[in-house]
Amino acid sequence: MLNSAMSVVILAAGKGTRMYSDIPKVLHTLAGKPMVQHVIDAATKLGAAQVHLVYGHGGELLKQTLKDDKLNWVLQAEQLGTGHAMQQAAPFFSDDEDILMLYGDVPLISVETLQRLRDAKPQGGIGLLTVKLDDPSGYGRITRENGKVTGIVEHKDATDEQRQIQEINTGILIANGADMKRWLSKLTNNNAQGEYYITDIIALAYQEGREIAAVHPARISETDGVNNRLQLSRLERIYQAEQAEKLLLSGVMLRDPARFDLRGTLHCGMDVEIDANVIIEGYVTLGHRVKIGAGCIIKNSVIGDDCEISPYSVVEDAHLEAACTIGPFARLRPGAELLAGAHVGNFVEMKKARLGKGSKAGHLTYLGDAEIGDNVNIGAGTITCNYDGANKFKTVIGDDVFVGSDTQLVAPVTVGKGATIAAGTTVTRNVADNELVLSRVPQVHKQGWQRPVKKK
């Protein structure tokens, strides 16, 4: 039977010495966001009324990074065990709510598994998440009598017989708030570690005749913790393999699932193709029949139907309408917008710029703070000079303009519809509709000229 409310405690006070880092362990990232954020997200999706984050090492950096006003920050000044950590949070527990305990360094725990654990919690008892391992060395063992859970024995305190038990404690459990506070008040540190173990509440509950229901996760990897960078890298690959599998089964063609990283949320239309070594970050939407070439990075962008992004292009905070083509080696920075059928070629960079329908910037170009009309040709080497050393200014180019190669447009400047800018021109004044503009130095020919001779 479920209580009407539930709060979550996330233990995140450890320094993570084996990470060999000045950054708190739980802030190391998996799939582009801190491990602890994955756990917070799971708690939120589960419907937690309150999330208590128990912190210690690097608390200020934790607060600066997470920036979540809904978190209740609970300081554990001394790390005296998991039971001690829960004791710091206990004053915030309501008697009539359930308390779910999670860990900031166990990032793959799923909402589905936690919901099953919550559903399985007996009235007045404890829901406990356990797994069976071929090699349970180092983990707390689940002790049973006649099939019923009676307690948890930490590895260092276990007898040889108990160490043969393969069912181990994951550390994740749920109990009523009033019961949790009572059991926490009875904990002692009379053990090999001299710490207060949260696991001792299992024996206390059993002694009171309370039922302990053990639940297994859908995947063992959900309960894997991180103590070093090797373990973190392994969980990263597990997570990415799971995301790739979901995409493949939903109809997305990943040419090499083992070389695809999703570090955010991806929504795809029909018949999307993604080549090897592509990284998706933030919130990305790909329309129908979109093709992403090898080595591309797409972040917080919307890509319209039938667009093709050629290899090694970077697209960030950009919006592409239908049938646009990008790259290879193109860079769309925040604020870039391509209207239907526009083309951005190799070594072209756009920032806060709009390229109109059917317009093309094929090679070696910078378009910043610019508004470019429809059917415009931007020649190779064109630069919108948008910065005077203090302020940014805008360039406006009308429809059907032809901009020759090696042109500089010194903003603020406007080029009218149908104008032609000759190659090598520096445009410093507004250009009227249909004008031809050129600013070349007259070409000089010197007959009989000889190159200088190198001095010996």
Curated annotation (Swiss-Prot):
GO cellular component terms given for this protein: cytoplasm; membrane
A Gene Ontology biological process term: lipid A biosynthetic process
Molecular function GO terms recorded: glucosamine-1-phosphate N-acetyltransferase activity; magnesium ion binding; UDP-N-acetylglucosamine diphosphorylase activity
Gene3D superfamilies: Hexapeptide repeat proteins, Spore Coat Polysaccharide Biosynthesis Protein SpsA, Chain A
Catalytic site positions: 363
Keywords: Acyltransferase, Cell shape, Cell wall biogenesis/degradation, Cytoplasm, Magnesium, Metal-binding, Multifunctional enzyme, Nucleotidyltransferase, Peptidoglycan synthesis, Repeat, Transferase
Cofactor remark from the record: Binds 1 Mg(2+) ion per subunit.
Residue ranges of the region described as Linker: 230-250
Cofactor requirements of the protein: Mg(2+)
Binding site for UDP-N-acetyl-alpha-D-glucosamine: 11-14, 25, 76, 81-82, 103-105, 140, 154, 169, 227, 333, 351, 366, 377
The UniProt record lists the keyword Heme: no
Main location: cytoplasm
UniProt key word NADP: no
EC number: 2.7.7.23, 2.3.1.157
Family: In the N-terminal section; belongs to the N-acetylglucosamine-1-phosphate uridyltransferase family. In the C-terminal section; belongs to the transferase hexapeptide repeat family.
Function description: Catalyzes the last two sequential reactions in the de novo biosynthetic pathway for UDP-N-acetylglucosamine (UDP-GlcNAc). The C-terminal domain catalyzes the transfer of acetyl group from acetyl coenzyme A to glucosamine-1-phosphate (GlcN-1-P) to produce N-acetylglucosamine-1-phosphate (GlcNAc-1-P), which is converted into UDP-GlcNAc by the transfer of uridine 5-monophosphate (from uridine 5-triphosphate), a reaction catalyzed by the N-terminal domain.
Protein name: Bifunctional protein GlmU
The organism of origin for this protein: Salmonella typhimurium (strain LT2 / SGSC1412 / ATCC 700720)
